[in-house]
Amino acid sequence: MMKINSYAKINLSLDVLDLREDGYHNIDTIMNLIDLHDVIEINRNNTNELKLSSNNSNFPTDKTNLIYKIFENLKKFRKINCSYDVFVDKQIPISAGLAGGSSNACEFLMYVNDDLSLNLSNQEIKEICRLTGADTFYFTSKKCVRATGIGNEFVRLSDFSNKNIIIVNNGMSISSKDVYDNLKESNGGLGKITVAIDSRDYETFYRKAFNTMESVSERLVEEISDIKEQLNNLGCDLSLMSGSGPTVFGIFENYNDYENCYSKLKDKYKYVFKTKTL
């Protein structure tokens, strides 16, 4: 049995651009991993059936799961004569804007590639991930990146690790499609924000960071704006929604404010995590 950590990501800024012919949207985003993670246990079996299970009853174990989808997409590139039993110990909230499902899928793909000595090229991995989900390929990077296209074209940015992060999620989920369908025009990209974070001008970055999906998601889940306000009042340097939400994160340069915020919010919402960027 192999155990693999599968990390969540946050969007340090996110702008949604135009709709593509393939149904995806072009985006401009800055992403970074955080230490919040699921643990995936993988055992090879000699059947033709991929068996998924989890400690979370809301975790899909059917063909809608991205682990299943990425395994099927892998078979378009290589002949596979075995399958796997996969148990996911879920710590990352589901459908929360933290890409837990995409992370699970990518980690599974990379494990199978190694386990079966498939020798997939980077381009093959990129295409398998594209067929599976827009942000899946990011998890091969594991760095602070500016991502464009559908989120699969990367420029690595300066290290943004070891930042104090509070994650807050009220237990609700949001359909990304519902948010995308109600978006208006973009903010014109992340040029200045990218320069700020890459030059470690965090004061400018914290002031200019944005997520164009927030305005739509806040109408669907009103508590998002309330959580942001509480994080701001408790001393965070930046509060922002991740992805399409409803998860909100706060970045704290001051460690005492970070600890105090966690203490004040940890019993107030369904999911409150104290974590760091990787």
Curated annotation (Swiss-Prot):
Catalytic activity: 4-CDP-2-C-methyl-D-erythritol + ATP = 4-CDP-2-C-methyl-D-erythritol 2-phosphate + ADP + H(+)
Major enzyme class: transferase
Alphabetized UniProt keyword annotations: ATP-binding, Isoprene biosynthesis, Kinase, Nucleotide-binding, Transferase
Gene3D superfamilies xref list: 3.30.230.10, GHMP kinase, C-terminal domain (3.30.70.890)
E.C. code: 2.7.1.148
GO function term, MF aspect, one: 4-(cytidine 5'-diphospho)-2-C-methyl-D-erythritol kinase activity
GO biological process terms, semicolon-separated: isopentenyl diphosphate biosynthetic process, methylerythritol 4-phosphate pathway; terpenoid biosynthetic process
Binding, ATP: 93-103
Active-site residues, record numbering mapped to chain: 9, 135
Pathway where it operates: Isoprenoid biosynthesis; isopentenyl diphosphate biosynthesis via DXP pathway; isopentenyl diphosphate from 1-deoxy-D-xylulose 5-phosphate: step 3/6
Top-level taxon: Bacteria
PANTHER family xref list: 4-DIPHOSPHOCYTIDYL-2-C-METHYL-D-ERYTHRITOL KINASE, CHLOROPLASTIC
Family indicated by similarity: Belongs to the GHMP kinase family. IspE subfamily.
Biological role: Catalyzes the phosphorylation of the position 2 hydroxy group of 4-diphosphocytidyl-2C-methyl-D-erythritol.
The protein's name in its UniProt record: 4-diphosphocytidyl-2-C-methyl-D-erythritol kinase
Taxonomic source organism: Finegoldia magna (strain ATCC 29328 / DSM 20472 / WAL 2508) (Peptostreptococcus magnus)
Gene name, Swiss-Prot/TrEMBL: ispE
